[in-house]
Regions:
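Acidic-and-aromatic substrate-binding clefts and catalytic sites of carbohydrate-active enzymes
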Residues: 24-30, 49-61, 126-135, 156, ...
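Short, electropositive alpha-helical surface patch
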Residues: 132-146, 218-220
C-alpha cells in the first residue's frame, strides 16, 4: 500500500480545501526554485513567506517572475527571522518587544517587500516560528495587513481586525523530538482532510532534501489527480474580520 493511501481514502469521502505555505524565502534559493517547479508542474498554487531582511536581486527577480506567471503568491515573513527573546521559546515578535519595537520591524519589512515586488505582495503576515503576541496583531491591523497565518495550535489573539488562516500540518512535524514517519504524516494529513476545515500544509524548502522533494511530489500528484481537491491560495480562505 502506498504511504499516501490514507490521504486518498480521506479525499474519497468529500471535498477538501487545501493550501500550501512555504516559509523562509531568502534562504536556500535553489531549493526554493525546485519546490516551486514541483507546484508549477502540477498546476497547484503555493504561498511563499518571504523574509524581507534576506532579499537579494536574484531572489527578487526569480520570485517576481514566478508570481507574475501565476500560481505563486508572496507575503511577509517577519523582518530578519531572528530571535529577540532572552530565554525560552524563539520569537521575533515576542513578549519582550513592545508595540512600537515590533512596528518598526514590521513596517520596514513591509516597505522592503513593496519596493521589491509592488502589488505582487499580499497583505498577509507569517511570524517566524509561528509565534507572535497581541501587540503584533495590533500592529498588523494598524498597518494594512488583513491576514495572519500561524499554526492551528496557537492561542487566539485579542485583535479581531486581522483574519487568521493557520497551517494545520507541518510537513516536518515531530513528536517528542522524533520526526513523524511517512505513514504518520499521511495519517495527520488524512485526519486534517476529514476535519472539514481547510487543510494548510507548512513546508520549509531550505531543509528539503531530494527524498523529501520526491515525497512532496507524490502528495501533489495525489491531490492534483483527485476530483475532491480544492487547492486554493491562503488569502482566499480568510473570513472577513469584525
Amino acid at each position: 500500500m502506498s504511504w499516501l493511501e490514507p490521504v486518498r481514502a480521506a479525499l474519497d469521502e468529500g471535498p477538501c480545501r487545501v493550501f500550501f505555505r512555504d516559509d523562509d524565502a531568502g534562504w536556500g534559493d535553489e531549493r526554493l526554485w525546485a519546490l516551486l517547479d514541483l507546484f508549477r508542474r502540477r498546476s497547484l498554487p503555493i504561498d511563499v513567506a518571504v523574509i524581507p531582511g534576506s532579499l537579494t536581486p536574484s531572489l527578487i527577480a526569480g520570485l517576481a517572475a514566478r508570481a507574475r506567471a501565476g500560481g505563486v503568491r508572496l507575503h511577509q515573513h517577519g523582518f530578519a527571522h531572528v530571535d529577540h527573546e532572552p530565554a525560552g521559546r524563539k520569537y521575533e515578535f515576542g513578549p519582550s518587544r513592545s508595540y512600537d519595537q515590533q512596528a518598526v520591524d514590521i513596517t520596514r519589512g513591509q516597505a522592503l517587500l513593496r519596493d521589491a515586488f509592488g502589488d505582487l505582495i499580499e497583505p498577509v503576515f507569517t511570524p517566524p516560528w509561528n509565534r507572535c503576541t497581541s501587540d503584533t496583531a495590533a500592529v498588523l491591523a494598524d498597518t494594512g495587513f488583513r491576514i495572519l497565518s500561524r499554526d492551528s495550535t496557537a492561542a487566539p489573539l485579542r485583535d479581531v481586525r486581522v483574519a487568521e488562516v493557520p497551517v494545520t500540518v507541518d510537513w516536518f512535524g515531530s513528536r517528542k523530538g522524533v520526526r513523524w514517519t511517512p505513514f504518520q504524516l499521511a495519517e495527520k494529513l488524512a485526519d486534517a482532510v476529514r476535519s472539514g476545515e481547510p487543510v494548510g500544509i507548512m513546508l520549509h524548502h531550505a531543509v528539503t532534501d531530494p527524498g523529501e522533494f520526491a515525497a512532496i511530489g507524490a502528495l501533489l500528484a495525489v491531490l492534483g489527480a483527485h476530483p475532491n481537491t480544492r487547492a486554493t491560495p491562503l488569502a482566499a480562505l480568510a473570513a472577513v474580520p469584525g
